[in-house]
């Protein structure tokens, strides 16, 4: 297919037009006074959203060169969303401002590579200043404030703070569509996995169709048990202490299963047999998690152990094990605290190094089951568009709250970026172009607060001047403007705070994408094919004639 090519100024101007289309649509959603954007869907009702990244992802432009600029900006928003869960609109606003100022300098004769080098120097200093500005999240109020700002709804903020308080910072919180009109929460205590009892004959509560064992001994193995003789030695030893016995194995079949069922029905032993969760390497890891949580040992031939060698010391313990046909919950495992902490740190390290989103999600689930708990947040609404929009806001608020716990909080409302501007004084530019890059950053970092003011119908320049004057007079870098009340004051005291991770990621990704655009000198794209004109219709047949 033939290609079209654009060079230098023409190429950069095309990218800028694409950037502007996306940024102008997205930045209207910034802040509590931000507007909604309606997105047409081929099927069903339109989506009405206040979420920047959702708007950005939907934009596709006809001109291939302009579309490249649009896609690059979407990349900045998406990357920020992936890393921090929020801050997509801020990243978009910053990137647009850097592109505008940068292109002006390049058009005036500046070297784009020197501009990029200056941007990199300035950004490194600013990122460190944001980290230094951050304060750790100490209480539930901070989490509530962060989530409230993200969702623009205090009820969502309070709900997320309550849920995070219950399941802990490492707990798994999932968001689902509910059946009602409001919000519902479900909690799971202990470790839960998606495998239930092997046979309904193990049920102890026929009303709830559950097997509920108090203070059982737990045999954990990755083997299939086919003969009762394999586990008879350990069974006889357990019966000296208790009748409550749980077996977690790859499978139980052959004569082993009917023998266990028969002894359960006779009352000889109160046994519960469960299939091991997961598959392959993940199964081995999950069995090891269960063993560490309960203080047991996984009986596996990989470590040279056979089932008939199992002793009471190899068995895990828990206050309670509950199983139905679909899932099992182990409550208050009696494992060693230090061993559990070491396992948690090991999983955390794996989360940091993995490149697969799927693996990361599964590792986070395992971490939550060991360290915290599991909560399900069910979101309801009167109509489907409202439900989707509300669910988006809850997911964003949850991600923002997690980011705040991770790296701390900074003043919100664009004030954090304004507060770190003096850090640029320490940058030593090697030439005039690098000096121009520092000036580009100074101008760009004011843009989020200008846009917040614009969305609230205020004059951004006046607000920035007033904020700077008040900060200088009172010596307080947290002073800012509340666009909801129209008052100046400490952003932290007013509960207007952002996660440092969100602010940092937004700046980092905005500079990265803007630098890429500024240093682009050629664009190559397919020449769009003209659609062929429809063929003329055939002649109508003549009625009454058979051939």
From Swiss-Prot:
Subcellular location per the Swiss-Prot or TrEMBL entry: Cytoplasm
GO CC annotation terms, alphabetical: cytoplasm
Pfam families tied to this protein: Cpn60_TCP1
Binding site for ATP: 29-32, 86-90, 413, 498
EC number per UniProt: 5.6.1.7
Organism domain of life: Bacteria
GO biological process annotation, one example: protein refolding
Keyword terms of this UniProt record: ATP-binding, Chaperone, Cytoplasm, Isomerase, Nucleotide-binding
Example GO molecular function: ATP-dependent protein folding chaperone
CDD domains given in the database record: GroEL (cd03344)
Family in the record: Belongs to the chaperonin (HSP60) family.
Function text: Together with its co-chaperonin GroES, plays an essential role in assisting protein folding. The GroEL-GroES system forms a nano-cage that allows encapsulation of the non-native substrate proteins and provides a physical environment optimized to promote and accelerate protein folding.
Subunit annotation: Forms a cylinder of 14 subunits composed of two heptameric rings stacked back-to-back. Interacts with the co-chaperonin GroES.
Name the record gives this protein: Chaperonin GroEL
Source organism: Herpetosiphon aurantiacus (strain ATCC 23779 / DSM 785 / 114-95)
Gene: groEL
């Amino acid at each position: 297919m033939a290609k079209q090519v654009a060079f230098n100024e023409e190429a950069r101007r095309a990218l800028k037009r694409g950037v502007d289309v996306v940024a102008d649509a997205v930045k209207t959603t910034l802040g509590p006074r931000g507007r909604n954007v309606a997105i047409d869907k081929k099927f069903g009702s339109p989506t009405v959203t206040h979420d920047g990244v959702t708007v950005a992802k939907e934009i596709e432009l006809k001109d291939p060169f302009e579309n490249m600029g649009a896609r690059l900006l979407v990349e900045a928003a998406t990357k920020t969303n992936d890393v921090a869960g929020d801050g997509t609109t801020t990243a978009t606003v910053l990137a647009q401002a850097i592109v505008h100022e940068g292109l002006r300098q390049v058009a005036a004769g500046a070297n784009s590579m020197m501009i990029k080098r200056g941007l990199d120097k300035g950004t490194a200093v600013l990122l460190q200043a944001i980290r230094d500005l951050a304060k750790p999240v100490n209480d539930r109020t901070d989490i509530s404030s962060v989530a409230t700002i993200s969702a623009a709804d205090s009820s969502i903020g309070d709900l997320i703070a309550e849920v995070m308080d219950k399941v802990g910072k490492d707990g798994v919180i999932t968001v689902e569509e509910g059946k009602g009109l409001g919000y519902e929460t479900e909690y799971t205590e202990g470790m839960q996995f998606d495998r239930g009892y092997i046979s309904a004959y193990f049920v102890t509560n026929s009303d709830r169709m559950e097997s509920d064992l108090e203070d059982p001994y737990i045999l954990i193995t990755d083997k299939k048990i086919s003969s009762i003789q394999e586990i008879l030695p350990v069974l006889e030893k357990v019966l000296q202490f208790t009748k409550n016995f749980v077996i977690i194995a790859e499978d139980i079949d052959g004569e082993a299963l009917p023998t266990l069922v028969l002894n359960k029905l006779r009352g000889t032993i109160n046994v519960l047999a469960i299939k091991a969760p997961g598959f392959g390497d993940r199964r081995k890891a999950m069995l090891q998690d269960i063993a560490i949580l309960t203080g047991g040992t996984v009986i596996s031939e990989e470590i040279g152990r056979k089932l008939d060698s199992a002793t009471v010391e190899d068995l895990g313990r828990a206050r309670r094990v509950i199983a139905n046909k679909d899932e099992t919950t182990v409550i208050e495992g009696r494992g060693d605290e230090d061993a559990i902490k070491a396992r948690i740190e090991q999983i955390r390290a794996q989360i940091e190094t993995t490149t697969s989103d799927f693996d990361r999600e599964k590792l986070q689930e395992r971490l939550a089951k060991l360290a915290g708990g599991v909560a399900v947040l069910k979101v309801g609404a009167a109509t489907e568009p409202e439900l989707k929009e509300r669910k988006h806001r809850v997911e964003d608020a949850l991600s923002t709250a997690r980011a705040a716990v991770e790296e701390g909080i900074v003043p919100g409302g664009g004030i954090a970026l304004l507060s770190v501007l003096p850090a640029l004084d320490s940058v030593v530019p090697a030439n005039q172009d690098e000096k121009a890059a520092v000036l580009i950053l100074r101008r760009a970092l004011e843009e989020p607060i200008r846009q917040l003011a614009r969305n609230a119908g205020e004059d951004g320049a006046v607000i920035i001047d007033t904020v700077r004057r008040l900060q200088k007079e009172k010596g307080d870098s947290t002073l800012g403007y509340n666009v909801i009340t129209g008052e100046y004051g400490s952003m932290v005291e007013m509960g207007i705070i952002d996660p440092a991770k969100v602010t940092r990621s937004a700046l980092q990704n905005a500079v990265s994408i803007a630098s890429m655009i500024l240093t682009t000198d050629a664009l190559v794209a397919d020449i769009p094919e003209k659609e062929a004109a429809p063929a003329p219709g055939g002649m109508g047949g003549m009625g009454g004639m058979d051939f």
